[in-house]
Curated annotation (Swiss-Prot):
It is found in: Cytoplasm. The lineage of its organism: Bacteria, Bacillati, Actinomycetota, Actinomycetes, Kitasatosporales. Keywords: Amino-acid biosynthesis, ATP-binding, Cytoplasm, Kinase, Nucleotide-binding, Proline biosynthesis, Transferase. Substrate binds at residues 57, 144, 156. This is Glutamate 5-kinase. ATP binds at residues 17, 176-177, 218-224.
Amino acid sequence: MAGARQAVGEARRIVVKVGSSSLTTAAGGLDADRVDALVDVLAKMRGADKEVVLVSSGAIAAGLAPLGLPRRPRDLARQQAAASVGQGLLVARYTASFARYGVRVGQVLLTSDDMSRRAHHRNASRTLDKLLAMGAFPIVNENDTVATDEIRFGDNDRLAALVAHLVRADLLVLLSDVDGVYDGDPSRPGTSRLAEVRDMGDLAGVDIGSAGKAGVGTGGMVTKVEAARIAAAAGIPVVLTSAVHAADALAGGDTGTYFHATGRRSADRLLWLQHASAPQGALVLDDGAVRAVVEGRKSLLPAGIAGVEGDFAAGDPVELRDGTGRAVARGLVNFDAKEMPRLIGRSTRELARELGPAYEREVVHRDDLVILHP
């Protein structure tokens, strides 16, 4: 464990995610003192010659008071209105706080749709790299004004994991109002903090849902553990801790929960396919094709397709489903949906003779495919 914590202290490029609950007052508004305390820690990291990207929630919380809202509204329209007003205030607060250290900030607003569109994905990566190279401090947020998934489900945790992979981070730090994952409700006596998670099997039997609840935000412990799973599977270790203990955690101290990296760093597009892409349709596979794709890691051929759903274009991400409707894989399809009816169930050799050599190929190549359920 000591070696793992030492690796935290030695990480050079770090993504830090902070939730609304760590930036707000008891009444739910933005707390300038808490923002300044976080910036003090982040600025010190930059001074130690580290590159840091901040993924920050808080736009909705910052917009509550200016709009006369006593608490986070439940209806989507007012949530988005609060986000629209609050995002500017949130960035202004960060700008003023970082100015104490002579550091400029750069705002990057993303949505799940941006991460799903490959061109946007590449541009976001280049922008973040350039901001870091030019000495600016990137502050990323889900675009709450239009990103309904984030507002409803607290998707900034997952966004942070994807950003960590996007910028090839050495470490992801998730800051919350709870000091790590506990084996029960941390407010009750007798519960213990889990110092490390070597693989997700270590959490079997742990009631993650009781280990922390967000107030003005939406991302509870469940979404944070899911974000840790995504990052760890992509080869990025994760520290989940309280914002109060951020400095100690980033220095490699024994605080929070450390998630060991469980996988190798994968190609950007594979993580994007598995966790960020929005499927534009589905291909239903027969039993033989399911075995070939899932167990044999083979490409999907027309002969193994039993049905087509949705209206997709060549190059779009689609789900591959078994006969029960379960999504077993996801991949980039090589044909438009309108072409599929004349292809399904037929051999590539037969299609090449009838339609030409362009049709003697896979519907989904194995290099453009990720398995969801082995």
